[in-house]
Amino acid sequence: MKRYSIAPTSSRRKSAIDATLPESNLPARQILEQLDQDTTFVLQEIDKNISRANTVINDKIKPMIQEYAFQSWKVWENTGFWKHFFEQSANVELDSYVEPINEVNPQNNFLLLNEIEKNKQKGRYEDSRGSNKVNQANNDENNDIDNDEKEEPEIAFKKPNLRRLVADGNTPTWSTEHTKPSMKSIQLSPPKRMQTTNFTGGLARENTKLTDSITLEPPALSAETRAVTSSPHSRHYQNQHQRLQSRDSPIKIHTIRQSLDTYHRVSISPKKLKTPIRSTRTSRIESILNSSPILPEPPVLQSEIGSETPKYMSSSSPMKKQQQQQRESLNFQSDNDQQQGLQRFPNTPKYSRLSGSSVNSLLSNKSNLSDDEDDHINPPPQLDSDNHGVVIDNSDTNNNNGDSSDDLAALPVPELNTIDFKDKNSNNNNKRSIQSTPRSSEKKRRSINTKNTNNNNTSAAATAVVVDDDDDRENVFLDHSYKKTPDNQQSNNSTRFFSTGGSNNDNHTETQDNSKSFSQIYDEAISKIRGKKTTSQSNDQNGDEDGDVVMSLDMTVTKDLTGEPTKDLSKDLTENSTTDLGPFRERWKKLTRK
């Protein structure tokens, strides 16, 4: 039973073979399949060959071409020098170019031109025979012409003649190029061979024959033309014409080689002549560029300047007076600025020697020094400061021979800011600290000044300068970590060493720092180990107020930081007590009290 499909037929092509076709079409299908297989095999072979060719080109041919290009570039760079050399030596310009070869065969062109010339000559010969007035000489000439015409195709393939190539604008070459006669040679009559019988007539005819050279001599001028050309206007025109003729010089062409379809040629042309205006302009520019730069006048050497012995210089020289006046004016201005208080950072310490006589001696003896010595010795800048101790003023030079001990005594004693020890467990009321107050420092300064006045009458009292807060904040040499007292007075600005400020988390309103010196910490540790409290005795003989201040600095009432007794540790750590110092014990106490 045969079944039929209900589905609609689709328009798509099916590649399946229908088994219901007759067996007569099977050979044709096999042939088609065989052809398809052959085409696929051929295409695969083509792809394989293309891939091989690409690998050969990329791996072998391309590197060789690149190497050849590199080497030829070197050759081109070297030949560039010789090209420039020959151009400059011959005063010419060399240009290389490529010209395509014409499609018309030069041999056929020569044959065509020769046939045209033959037809013209035959027509002339027939006219001469019809008139019956042609001599034997003319017949011989015609025969010679015919012989020349027969020989011309053979000559065309040989080495070209120099005169013909000059007329055509070409130069002799040794390539396979076939020369073509120009249109000028077609229009002119062909050259005729003269007989040797009439020698003088042959010379005359050779002189009258047109040559192939470009530069022809102009005809001789008659008397009328000479009269006309004698005018100035005609002379100007004639000079201009001669200039143009000299400018339009002939160009020679050389064929270097012939490739498949092109000629590689080189043209040799003379350099263009520059116009007078342009030449003058370029000459001016070149003269400016090549000339040496305009320099100022050289300095005139004088006897006073540059001499090796400045001590023999006269003190009344104008140069020396002028320099001395300039220095005096500058020093006067600097002194006025310092007196007016224009210094921005007055709190910066003044760095000078103890005696101060070196600076003052330099300033006072400035006029006695020579110019060369004065230039090399400049005084240091003068800086005043209040917070860094007493400024010593040694204006009086009569007491320069004073003892160094007096100078040392005049210097201020630096104050030590101590480390804070705060007990977090204890209350703030139990804390006791010793801090240097501005009043104590003032008392110390007063006592030092009174001692200095008793020893040396020439020492001056220290002066205080009120400085703005803004300048103190901008001064990088000052320590801004200190706090002001409730009396709004500034504390000492000495550098604080090893300061560690402890902060209380509960109370943030504390304004006073609890500080102790290293000696106090050492004595407290020893006293805690022994179970005693340290007491210091005052050895100051003056009995002044500053002695009480020093005693108050040394006297401390301490409390154990941890709140626990440390008597048990006294046996182990008794070796660190001051009793083992021996003769250095009293010296250590003196150092700790100062």
From Swiss-Prot:
Residues 313-326, 352-368, 393-403, 449-466 have a biased composition (Low complexity). Residues 327-350, 487-506 have a biased composition (Polar residues). The keyword Nucleus applies. Keywords: Cell cycle, Cell division, Centromere, Chromosome, Chromosome partition, Cytoplasm, Cytoskeleton, Kinetochore, Microtubule, Mitosis, Nucleus. InterPro entries: DASH_Ask1 (IPR013964). One of its GO terms (cellular component) is mitotic spindle. Disruption phenotype: Short, often misaligned spindles with an extensive network of cytoplasmic microtubules. Cell cycle arrest in mitosis with unseparated DNA. Inviable. Residues 122-152, 170-193, 226-249, 288-468, 480-594 are annotated as: Disordered. Residues 561-574 have a biased composition (Basic and acidic residues). Residues 141-152 have a biased composition (Acidic residues). One of its GO terms (biological process) is filamentous growth. It is found in: Chromosome, Centromere, Kinetochore; Cytoplasm, Cytoskeleton, Spindle; Nucleus. The keyword Acetylation does not apply. Component of the DASH complex consisting of ASK1, DAD1, DAD2, DAD3, DAD4, DAM1, DUO1, HSK3, SPC19 and SPC34, with a stoichiometry of one copy of each subunit per complex. Multiple DASH complexes oligomerize to form a ring that encircles spindle microtubules and organizes the rod-like NDC80 complexes of the outer kinetochore. DASH complex oligomerization strengthens microtubule attachments. On cytoplasmic microtubules, DASH complexes appear to form patches instead of rings. Belongs to the DASH complex ASK1 family. Component of the DASH complex that connects microtubules with kinetochores and couples microtubule depolymerisation to chromosome movement; it is involved in retrieving kinetochores to the spindle poles before their re-orientation on the spindle in early mitosis and allows microtubule depolymerization to pull chromosomes apart and resist detachment during anaphase. This is DASH complex subunit ASK1. It comes from Candida albicans (strain SC5314 / ATCC MYA-2876).
